[in-house]
Amino acid sequence: MDMDTRTRCGIIIACIALLTGYCIVDGIKAQVPSERRESVSFRTMGTVAAVTFYDPGDGVLQKGCETVKAEFEKIIRIANLYDSGSELAQLNRTAYQKEFFCSELLWQMILEAEYAFHFSGGAFDITVKPLMDLWGFYRKRGEAPNENEIKEALNKVGFHKIVLDKKKRSIRFTVPGMGIDLGGIAKGLALDLAAQKSAGLIERGVLDLGGNLKFLGGKKSYLVGIKNPSAPDRLSDKTFHAPPGSSVSTSGDYERKVIYGGKVYGHIIDPVSGYPERGKYSATVCCRSAMRADWLSTAVFLRGKKLAEKAEKEMNPCHIILVEK
């Protein structure tokens, strides 16, 4: 959809959101019938994004969309694994031979990933790339990997196997063949950056990046519904109110997948076992930082209620909902 294609987003947001994990309803819209919502959607970072503003002035939505796209592009140039010229691709090629000096934004993601690794007990680990390669999530293979292949890949996985120099903002791999995948953290940072830049344009709005949501300003909360993980084309009976300024992310095993021998494998790989996790539920996280919500939903999907309880206790404000299959 191009920039001139606008719509009252009551329908478009619901449709896009249903595809990506959410249905957003303004909890008190019925009491404020004059409130107007406009939205524009576009493809970026391998998914669909949508920018929604409430009661925007003339030209504000277009300017806001351009602002959001510019922030997303910053992260794409850094974290795109499919672009050999991206900063992350350069890091993965050279960090075993010599230390790699990171840009400020890449370093920000790596430090958050370090915290995530320790907080989750290794459930979230950006060094999972060798396993993602092995299981065919970048380039499909003919059959599922065997146990020996998984063990070999696991030797290259583990955040504790990289060396960070926080004074020089550098990183070095200690094992050949290691690689970083920022897929579980980059979209969150992109949303945080876009929200910061959008703050002066609009009082109230929603940014949606492939189902990762950031709610902008205002005083009203947003009613969020969550997909049924057993029937992803329908919503579950779980809803919650997300406050202004908060972020929401859901992880489940019903999105990206590969099929080997008639068996379906979801894209969320446990970096400890080396196998894709068949979750009992989906995990939805609501907290202030979109980057934190991004990785935490993945970690909670893998580790379940115990980690969810820890996060709610130690990351307040943080709200987590598990929807069982």
Identify the function of each model-found stretch.
Residues 2-325:
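Mature catalytic core of soluble alpha/beta enzymes
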